[in-house]
Design a protein with these regions (language model features):
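Cysteine-centered loop/knuckle micro-motif
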Residues: 52-54
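Short, aromatic-enriched amphipathic alpha-helices that serve as compact interaction elements
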Residues: 64-80
Length: 165
């Protein structure tokens, strides 16, 4: 990997804000050690790149809005960051596991569109979105959902969602 970085000038994030993998383990970080080329646009669609967008949230920064959390959760699905998805899911509705690695066929995520975001009050919000994906070699499909979010202790959490037809 070091040779790839020297040749291509790419910066890779491995342990995120925790520093080296050893420092991450000492700090109690239990997430997967994922890597992504920071020159690549963020999976949520932001051309600024993963390290300046959803990567910051995946590394522990709190989302400023429910829509920002929604985008980071979409990116986590793309990157199979089950650790982040579960950590950003409200404790009252969080499943024990998502089993993303066992999904067959695994979805190929094609894009995210935030249709509407509405602040209910200071600590509750609703985000309507469409996520496009493909299963195996099949045709593209859409997941159109209205999701509810709650903020506790300054952090937004996904509560639940309602699929739309």
């Amino acid at each position: 990997m070091d040779e790839f970085v020297r040749r291509h000038g790419a910066t890779l994030r491995i342990a995120g804000m925790h520093g080296t993998p050893a420092q991450a383990r000492r700090s109690g970080y239990k997430g997967g050690m994922k890597s992504i080329d920071t020159l690549t646009p963020c999976p949520c669609g932001n051309p600024a790149g993963y390290s300046r967008c959803c990567g910051l949230l995946h590394d522990g920064l709190a989302a400023a809005t429910a829509a920002q959390l929604m985008r980071s959760r979409y990116s986590a699905y793309v990157l199979k960051r089950e650790d982040y998805l579960l950590a950003s899911w409200h404790a009252d509705t969080r499943p024990a596991s998502l089993r993303l690695a066992a999904q067959q066929p695994a979805p190929t995520w094609l894009g995210l569109e935030i249709r509407q975001q509405r602040q209910i009050d200071e600590d509750h919000a609703v985000v309507e979105f469409v996520a496009r994906y493909r299963l195996g070699g099949g045709r593209a499909q859409r997941q159109h959902e209205t999701s509810r979010f709650a903020r506790e202790d300054g952090r937004w959490y996904y509560v639940d969602g309602e699929l739309k037809s």
